[in-house]
Amino acid sequence: MGVHECPAWLWLLLSLVSLPLGLPVPGAPPRLICDSRVLERYLLEAKEAENVTMGCSESCSLNENITVPDTKVNFYAWKRMEVGQQAVEVWQGLALLSEAVLRGQAVLANSSQPFEPLQLHMDKAISGLRSITTLLRALGAQEAISLPDAASAAPLRTITADTFCKLFRVYSNFLRGKLKLYTGEACRRGDR
């Protein structure tokens, strides 16, 4: 073993420690989110969760209104935004959506008769949002929050969700809309 070589187990250990912290993993592709198959996997999971909740009634009520990001996109305004401004909007939306899904999980945990398939999809959504957050950090989206554009960004538009179906619909639409638009543009430009 030379002076600059590290054993394989050390790279693995560094990778396991770095991922949850959102740090770049040595030897890993730094722009994994630019691979369309990665985002498509999370889109499929979100759509499956939405479809499962369409069929349930009372067991899918949140019994409260949870604030979620508005997923409507004005494409004309979006295209005119700087990539940094888009990153701010996506990052804020992702943070709010993560809070909403965690709140939904808490509501489900306190339910007297939890709908079993719903718990599985809540867990997948939480895991997916954490992974997407890590991938966006690797793309440099978090750094945009500290840029001057972030201070002048319009406040995030929000709506409320009162059912798990609506919560998962917002999750699915957010991934298909703003997140996909932002990552597509950031990956094309090579912004980091």
UniProtKB/Swiss-Prot annotation:
Where primarily located?
secreted
Disulphide bridges, residue numbers: 34-187, 56-60
Cleaved signal peptide residues: 1-27
GO BP annotations of the record are: erythrocyte differentiation; erythrocyte maturation; erythropoietin-mediated signaling pathway; positive regulation of cell population proliferation; positive regulation of Ras protein signal transduction
Q: Which residues are glycosylated?
A: 51, 65, 110, 152
The question of whether Secreted is a record keyword is answered with: yes
Q: In which tissues is it expressed?
A: Produced by kidney or liver of adult mammals and by liver of fetal or neonatal mammals.
Q: Where is the protein situated, by its record's location annotation? A: Secreted
- Superkingdom field: Eukaryota
User: What does UniProt give as GO cellular component?
Assistant: extracellular space
The keyword Secreted belongs to this UniProt entry's keyword annotation? yes
The family assignment reads: Belongs to the EPO/TPO family.
Main function = Hormone involved in the regulation of erythrocyte proliferation and differentiation and the maintenance of a physiological level of circulating erythrocyte mass. Binds to EPOR leading to EPOR dimerization and JAK2 activation thereby activating specific downstream effectors, including STAT1 and STAT3.
Q: What is this protein called?
A: Erythropoietin
Q: Which organism is it from?
A: Macaca fascicularis
